[in-house]
Amino acid sequence: MNVNIRRMTLEDIVQVVAIDRVSFSLPWPERSYRFEVTDNPASRAWVAEADGNIIGMIVAWLLADEAHIATIATLPGFRRRGIARALLTHALQTMISEGAKNAVLEVRAGNLAAQEMYRRFGFEESGRRPHYYKDNGEDAILMSLSDLQVNRETSN
């Protein structure tokens, strides 16, 4: 399977929202993705595409020298195939080249697969937001990566 990672466009929004809806119990509304693509100067958004279909996406914000991973997801049938890893690698490498020195994100306490991937990149748990997710009161785990540089995962 040949996967191409490219900037998210307005034409991708319908497929991106579909990925979001099957991936998260609290998906972003379509207008949020439109804002990220057209109006948010801090936003960096990409999609992973295979055979003309969007199979994954990531939205990150570059805030001063900090890369904030806002959301990342792949279609269920494409999980555990390195798509999210490729998206995160691409996002971090791009933001490093734009001056990012560290990275942060939030992840559900129960999303162990995502936490495992983030740890492979060097992210460490830096805090917890109790009852953060409104649908079920689940905690958010805050993870951070200090001294961001091309490392063992981002160099793949």
What function would you assign to each model-found segment?
Residues 4-79, 88-98, 146-156:
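Acetyl-CoA-dependent GNAT
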Residues 15, 116-117:
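Well-formed, non-transmembrane alpha-helical positions, independent of function
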Residues 74, 85-86, 102, 108, ...:
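Preference for well-ordered, secondary-structure-rich cores of eukaryotic proteins
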Residues 82:
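Conserved G/P- and acidic residue-centered "switch" motifs that form tight phosphate/ATP-binding loops
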Residues 88, 110-114, 131-136:
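Short glycine/proline-centered loop/turn elements that form peptide/ligand docking sites
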Residues 95-106, 129:
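Conserved GNAT acetyl-CoA-binding A-motif
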Residues 106, 119, 124-141:
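Conserved catalytic-core motifs of GNAT/GCN5-like acyltransferases
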